[in-house]
Structures are given as C-alpha cells and as structure tokens.
Amino acid sequence: MDNNQIPKNSPESSAINSAESSPKSNVSSDVLHENHHKEQQQLQQQLQQEQQQQQLPTTPQSEPTQRVNNNEEGIEMDRIAENSNINVPSDVGESSLKTISGYPSSKNTEAGSSSSGKKEEDYNYRSTWVPKLHQELFENPEVLESRRTKQRASNYRKTLEREKEGIKPLDNILEELKANANGLTKAEAQKRLEEVGPNAIPDVKRYPILEFLYFMWNPLSWTMEVAAIVSIALLDWVDFILICALLLLNATIGFIEENTAGNAVEALKNSLVSQIRCMRDGEWVMLPSPDLVPGDVVMLKIGAIIPADCRVIEAEQVKIDQSSLTGESLPVTKKIGDEVYSGSAMKQGEAKCVVTATGVNTFFGRAANLVQETEGHGHLQVILRNIGLFCISFIAIWVLVELLVDFLGYDGYCHGVGGGRCLPLNNALVLLVGGIPIAMPTVLSVTMAIGATQLSKKKAIVSRLASIEELAAMDILCSDKTGTLTLNILTVDEPLPVGDTPKEDIVFHAFLACSEGEDQDAIDKAISNYCRDTYPNVDYSGNEIVKHYPFNPEDKKAMGLVNANGKQFKTAKGAPQIILREADNYKQVGEAVEKEIENLADRGYRALGVSVSYDAPDFKVWHFEGLIPLFDPPRHDTEDTIKRALEMGVSVKMITGDQLAIAKETARRLGMGGNLFTIPYLENNDLGISEGEVIEMADGFAEMWPEHKYKVVDQLQKRKHVVGMTGDGVNDAPALKKAQIGIAVAGATDAARSVSDIVLTSSGLSVIIDAIISSRKIFQRMRNYVIYSVAATVRICTTFGILTVAWNFKFPTIATVIIAILNDGTMLTISKDRVRARNEPDQWNLFEVFTMALCYGFYLVGSTIVFFAIIHDGTWFHDAINLRILTDNELRGLIYLQVSISGLATIFVSRSQGFSYFERPGNLVIFAFVMSQIVATFIGVYGFRGYPHDSFSDNPDYPVHGTNFQGCGWGWAVCAWIWCFLWYIPMDFIKLGVTYILRGKIEPINKDALRKIYGWFGKEIPKEATQVSHKVAEQQAKRDALHAQETHHKSVVTDNKV
C-alpha cells in the first residue's frame, strides 16, 4: 500500500510512519514544543472561522478505534470516531455532502467507478486505523483537509480549556520541570530530593507526652482517678501517692512496650516499600518510591500503585483505578498528556510518565493535609468499653449498698456506724481501687502489639492490629491456587503442534510474545528457559521484537510485533480457547484441540495456545499453531497443611482463574475434594439449592474473574462466615478489601498490598496457617486476661462488701493498692505467655466471658468468706493445729495474703482450656507469679505501716484510714497457702462444667493433651492438633452431600439422554 492519497506533510502521514517504524510512540518535549508554537496562530484563525460555519447533517456514531497518532496536536482518529456529529464547512460542494450522507452524486459515482481498483487495493490499510464509518472521507480530499484543520482547531480549543482549568500542556510541563523523556541525572535528582524532600506524606507529628497520657484516658482510668480524688478528700496521702503510682506504672509500661513493638513492625513495613522503575542517567533502575523527585521519568505497569502525580508521555492501553481519590467506580482510560494521581492503581496496560509532584504537593498529599483522618472505634475498643462498663456497674452496685448500709445505720448488722469519720468514703475507696482492672487496656494493647511482632517473625506483617482478632476468628480461607497452593514454578512439557507445524516454531513464536528482563512473569520465564535450553543453536538475531503487548486480563493474551528481515508478523500466546477461537483454522482443528486441552487438564497440565499472523499491517487473520503444556506442581507441604487447617476449623477453598478441569485435578492432588464450580454454573445450577449454599459447601471455584471473587466473599459473609482472602494482583483488590482478612501473598502488587490487612513475606499456605495459630494464641492471651480481670473485680468487690456489711470489717485501702500493683505487674507478662491455640475459630463472646468470670469470682468469694468466718467467729484452727488467735488488725494481714494468693492463682485456671495442671505457663509468667507472691507473703507475715503514728485499733469506733495493718505470722501464712491450694483444685472442674453448659462440649483429653504434661519438663508441645472440630465435621458432611447430589443429578441427566 502506498500513501499517495495522504498529503506527505499531514499528521496522518507522520502517524503512519511512526506506527511502522517505532515500537512505541514517543513524545518528546522538542516535538510538542515545535508543533505547539508553529500552528498556534493558524489554529486561532481557524477557531474564528469555525464559529461562522454551518453544521451539516450527521452520520451515526461509530465505535472508537485505537489511536494511531499519539501527538496531542495531531489528528486523533479515535476522537473522530467518538464524536457523534461530523461538521463539514459550508464551502464544501453539494456533491461532497451527498457522498458523506450516503447519497453519492452521479459525478462521484463515475469517478468511483474509474478508480474502484485502487480503492479496493487501499481499503485494507485504511481500515486498520480509520473508522469504517468515515472511510468516505478519503473519497473527497477537500472534506478530509477541512476535517484535519477542524480537528486541529478542536484540539487547540481543548488545550486552551485545559490551560484555563490550570492543566498545562505536556510540553509546558516538561519545560518547567527542565526534564525530557530520558529522565534526570543522579546528581540533579539528588539536588531536587534535598530541595523538595522525600516522596512521602509526612507522618502526623507525634507528641510522646500525649501518647503517654492517652494510656490514662479511658473509663477504667477515670474511675481510678476518681479514687485518687477521694483519697485527697480523706487526707489519705499515702493512698493518693500509691494510686497515682499505679496509674503511672501502667501508662509507662504500656507506652514502652507498645512503642517497642510498634517500631519493630513499622520497620518491617518499611522494608515492603514499593520499588519503582525509574530512568536515571539514561538507564532504567529500580528506586524506592520515596526517592522520586519532580522530573523523574518512571515506567508503570499493571498492578502498580502510582507513587506520585505524573503526566503520561507514553501509553499502552492504560486504565487507572482512581476510586480511592475521586470515587469513580470504573477505571479511567488515560492517554498521552493526561494526568495520573498518586495513590491510584494501574488496572491495565503500562505507561511511561514524568513525575510532576511528590509528597504533600500531590493531589493526595494536599487532601491529606486538609482533612484530619479519623479512625472509627476498633473492635477491641468496643470490647474494652463493654467490659469496663460491666466492671464499673458491678462496683457501683456495691458502693451503693455500702453507702445505704452506712448512712441508714443498720446497727443490727453493722456496729459502730455513723461515727462521723467519713467511713463510707473510705469503704468506697477500697472497692474503687481493688475492683477496677486498671491494667486491662495496657495489657491488651501490649498483647496485640507484641503479637504483631510475633506474627512478623512468622513471615506475616500486620498492617491493621484489629486483623489479629479477625484472623483468629476466620473459618473460611479462599486461597489463590498459583503460588500459594502450588510452587508457581511452571515447567514446559513437550509442545503439541497442529498439523505439520514444527514444534520449535510453536515454542519460538511463544518466545517472541514474551516480555523481557524483570517484567517476565512465570509463564514467560518458563518458555524463555525452555526455548534457550532445548534449542540452544537457534539463531534469534534476525527477529527483532518491535513491540510487546503485555498480558491483558480482559482478553487473556500477550502479543509481540516482530520484524523479520524487513517483514513484519505478530505472534500471540494466551488462554487456548481465546487464541483458538480467533484463528482461521478453528473449524478444522477446534474440536480436536479442545479435546486435547481437556486431556491435558485431566492430567494436571495448563495449556497455552500459540498463534501467528502474517496478515500485515492489520493482522486480522490468525493461524493457530498448537499448544504448550505447562505444569505448576503443588507444594510439598500443601496437602498436609490443608488437613491441618481443617483440624483447626478452617475450610480452605481454592480460587483460581484456571480452567475447571485444571482446578479439579489440582484439588484432587491436594485432597481438597471435587466440588469445584464456575460462577455461571452456580447462577444456573439445577441442584435445587440456593447459590449461597452451593458457595458455602463448595471446595473451590475456577475460571474466576475479579467480580466473581468479590461475589464469593460477599455470599460467604452473608452466611455469617469470617472470610480470609488471598491475592496478589490489582484485580484481587476488591475481594481483598471486602474480606474480613485480606492477605497479600509474597510478591503481591502494590495495589494488593495497599488494601490487605496482612502481607506475607514468604510463599505457601503453611505461612497462613502458622499466622492463624499465632493469632489464636494472641487472642487466647487476651481472653484469659479479661476473664481473670473481671473475676478479680467480682471477687474483691463482693468479698469486701460482704465483710463490711456483715461483720463491719474495714479493710485497709493500702492493701488493695498493693494487690493491684502486684497483680498488674504479673499480668503484663501474659502477653508472652505460653498458650495452646484452640482447634476452632476464636472470637469474643462476652456472655461466656462474664459467665466464667462470675463463676470464678463468686467461688473465690466463698473461699475467703468461709476462711474469715472460721477464724473470726470460731477457734477451729487454734484448737486443731494450735495456731494463736488473731486480733482484727492481724486478721487484716491474713485476709490480704489469702486474697492475693487465691486471686492471682486464678490466672492459671483461666489460661488453660482443659486441666490447668497439664498446660505449663510461660517461664516469664511463672517467674512473675513467684516474685509477686514472695512479696505478698512477706507483707502478710510482717504487715505494712504507712503513717508511723497511725495504727488500727480493736475499738470498732476507731477511724480506719487504711494505711497500716499488722502481720499474721508465718504459721498463719502457711495455713493461708494450704487453704488456697485446696480451694484451687476444684476450679478446673468448675471451668469444664461451665464450658460444657455454654458450648455443649469440652476440650477432649487425648494423647496429645496427656503428652503436654511433659511440657513441665521442657519437652516440645506437639504442634498439630488431632481433633477435628464438630463444625468442620459438619461442613465436610455438607460437602459430601453436595457431591452426592451433584453425582445423582448427572446420572439422571445421562439416563434421560439415553
């Protein structure tokens, strides 16, 4: 085809030459600058003429075609196609108008007849870059030239409009940035980095003092602060100082531990900072996104998060997801000269861009500066609030009871009341200080922060702390097949040619459609390695890859434009069904090829279709050459890991875009079951059950698109499941964000990682299972501590309330402060306790927590009240074992010791799932318990003196300021220890009984549980559980029923056909 019909100096001519000679259309600042100024005056005049022109009849709207000329000031044929109106100047003749309108004049008919041969010769070429609807423009050079001028005027008008909006033309931007398509030098980039700073949004300025005080700003701390004010009112300065010390101690420990753990996790997050391909000194290098500066030239490909505001200087089928910035639900097509914004995601194609703004100067950065981002209350905060309200309400009830008793003067029960000594306030102070679990927020936040650090050691980096709770509660994991269940190391098997096509041609043409360098994916690497290893003597030098078309999820293929000794051809590789159906030999070989694809799938192979087109220049005719079998072997540990997940109550569902047959074969090899479906089948199934039920019982899904993954997650959530979703690509982002736990696998794109709750740094399903186990242990630590703390509130308030009301026994406030300090110091070690993860998903059940805590608390109240009553009202211990009779002041020391021992020992019961004797605590917990009880024993034996002049008197009318009490001696201390141990033994049976009532079952005692006894002697606890949970067994039964129903349905259909 010659180009004589097109003027040599026209934009069409330059566009054709550009398309034929270069792999990608480059736009430099020199070309744009020259075109812009050269035609400026001419276009301004044309604008004036255009306003006087009359509009003529229109043609129907045609579909847009692909842009050929990327010059912003040239003719853009895709914009012509998108216009619904074709306006022809009034000076064009009537014959021209009739030709365009579809009514050719006789003169034009004759001319067309004389030149029909040439028209047919030129048709194919024009149809590759001009909308078919507008081909008649070429019949009339006058109309075409007018259209060119009109389009250039339209382009200039749009340029002026962009300037008015503050959007400068690309050539102006490059000129202002002092940049070009070759990027910056390293020296210039370093200079600009020092001037503008790193490409990052500055962290919110931290105020350590405010962060420290935040640990004292919660309802529980407020209650303790009220207690401090009450102690001031009582002029009880020792209590005031100790209460303040307790508040400061909790805040200090929480601040230090949380910052230490947070800094460790933040360092790991920083190691995941995205790397951007940037041109420096004329060479492509990988740079961290914070090192980018205005003027840098970067290459963005599918899946990347755009690191800064940029302008496109080269584009290849680019679509950008701007929903996080603009709220647009659909991806936006970007062309040369368009702006792309920081924080957007590349959904399709690749683009070469110049950075125009970084950091706070970006569109996203300016918004971040203007809007104060607020976080909603996390689930843990809601749980803490509810627990705090329960404890405060319980304390308030007993305070009211004591106040009523004291002020109403029930002398029949209380002696010496109404002495005018502020005794009601003193009694209330005891309940406030002893009952408030002041360390709870600190312990739980520290447990979460340290847990995040522990998860990072398991190759799972947590980006949202609340996801630890959700991971522990997860009962369904939708796992990507490639790279997670399999090795993602594809191996090429023997090619299968069609007809007499040589095998080396299939592999060679597939190789020419592969990307090169760091952009290669697993398929490209497998083909490239096979081609070089199998055919090392083949000379590739005569074939130049002019242009590579990357894999597009929409049409599921990749292509290469090749120049072979002056002749051009295209090769394509991709999904075999799509490649096959586009081929000219589909009717001849289609049935046989599709059968072979099924045979390969049955054997666990993935087929890659290969075709070639020599139909230059439009390449519409393709010839299918054959199949390349690919095999991605399962990981060696995947089958065992899936069984392990089932034993833990987590159902693993395969999610893959591969064909159904391949997915079924992979599932069979992994022992996952055979209930795999495609979404179209689910929507139109004949099984007689709803789509949601089938999704719930299915073992996996094949041929999945992004919207299908989202739908699966949504249906499972509607059925009250906690769903985890793995993914790695930009198309997985919606489903990752929808799931309660979005998990970005190793090597995931920036887009996937940005919306994920957990980012894996190692491949394989076992990493996820290890993370689940760790999260359940973290949850168990938090749950155990909450049960202990609520039980302590119930125990202390009820015990001292009854002692005051029934015996007028005033307990010293200082004793409760000491108990709180020792207990809280011990409980801070719970974050590193050695616990056993449950075999079922774990989540907060406050009814169960409060029920267990009330049972423990009232049981321990009984142990203290019975112990007190025997000593206070009788002489059994004196008569039986010859212990001396205690005064009331010495009895206070004994009761202090008994309450301290029995209360802290509760943690051993609450931290275990079965018998506490079989589950050894962590060494740090044991050490803290022993040290705290040594201190408590010495205080109980020798007493405590606050004010030297203040001492308790046996006179019931003597004011009790609560600063002193006498010791009980070693004999009574040993008695208290024995008493506590005897009452401790039945607590495990109480726990198991309550658990059975609430759950309908208890943790089974099996060989593994018994072997845990040896954990006391340092032997390793078996990691894998052996008990399959009731829930998983039920799910497996449902899956079996579904499989049987599907098999029966198929047999009925077969019988009907027969």
UniProtKB/Swiss-Prot annotation:
Q: Name one GO biological process term.
A: regulation of intracellular pH
From the record, give the transmembrane residue ranges: 213-232, 238-258, 388-407, 426-447, 784-805, 811-833, 850-870, 890-910, 923-943, 968-988
Highest classification ranks of the organism:
Eukaryota, Amoebozoa, Evosea, Eumycetozoa, Dictyostelia
Q: Which PANTHER family match?
A: CALCIUM-TRANSPORTING ATPASE (PTHR42861)
**Organism field:** Dictyostelium discoideum
Single GO cellular component term: plasma membrane
Q: Which GO terms describe its molecular function?
A: ATP binding; ATP hydrolysis activity; metal ion binding; P-type proton-exporting transporter activity
Q: What is its EC number?
A: 7.1.2.1
| Composition-biased stretches (Low complexity) | 41-66
Biased amino acid composition, Basic and acidic residues: 31-40
Q: Where is the active site?
A: 480
Q: What is the membrane topology listed in the Swiss-Prot or TrEMBL record?
A: Multi-pass membrane protein
Name listed for the protein in its UniProt record: Probable plasma membrane ATPase
Asked whether the UniProt record includes Plastid among its keywords, one would answer no
Recorded hits in SUPFAM superfamilies, A to Z, give:
Calcium ATPase, transduction domain A (SSF81653), Calcium ATPase, transmembrane domain M (SSF81665), HAD-like (SSF56784)
What's known about how it's activated or inhibited? Acid pH levels increase its ATPase activity.
